[in-house]
């Protein structure tokens, strides 16, 4: 790899690619972003390393790039192994996600396990650390995720989804790239998942994954009845000054994902209450 600042190729859908821009600039890294449809673009050959965070055709893309001599992280082999870990037979149990970062030389870190809450088959809220887990279960889940990432030879950030029932923890799905479940790290961790992913694929020392508060709650908001998605800022910013907004788009179809909000604090019931209020207000379910 060149001793000058490297060029990194990001193959991802628009929203995901945009998440890498700020940490990339902070590290002085040149990013070239490509849609999954542009994976054959000649500029990819200019990149010292390419990472794939596309939701579709990622295995096909990785295989073609590696055959062309491009350094891809994570590799086709790791991505293929991760895809085999999916277990669709999940009973009613606590759903958590553990984010892991791993570099080529084997340094690995993990963030606090996150409880994932869904409604109508949509991911709506995450709570970190997962409040229903004992410290022993948290450590068990983190170790399971770390061991899995090493087993498949993952490089970069991966999201390991798990089912927890009593003392049993099992892997049910794996996303071998940064994931929505880790968006709480943008405002709630010393090093967020997107910066950590860049560090990992470039084989740089990994950052501190510690939380910045006792609890961090993140909520996804979808397009509702608000004709103006900007006006809710007036009420919500005045009510909860510590609330962090990440608006992906200004308009959309009903039910479409519009962005996420995050709040950190030490009083979990209060933090959840504020996030729930903000989600309802943003989605037009309440007016005050």
Identify the role of each PLM range:
Residues 1-80:
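ATP-binding N-terminal substructure of ATP-dependent carboxylate-amine bond-forming enzymes
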Residues 59, 70-71, 103-106, 118, ...:
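Generic secondary-structure signature for well-ordered alpha-helical cores
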Residues 168-178:
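A short beta-strand motif that forms the metal-chelation/ATP-contact edge
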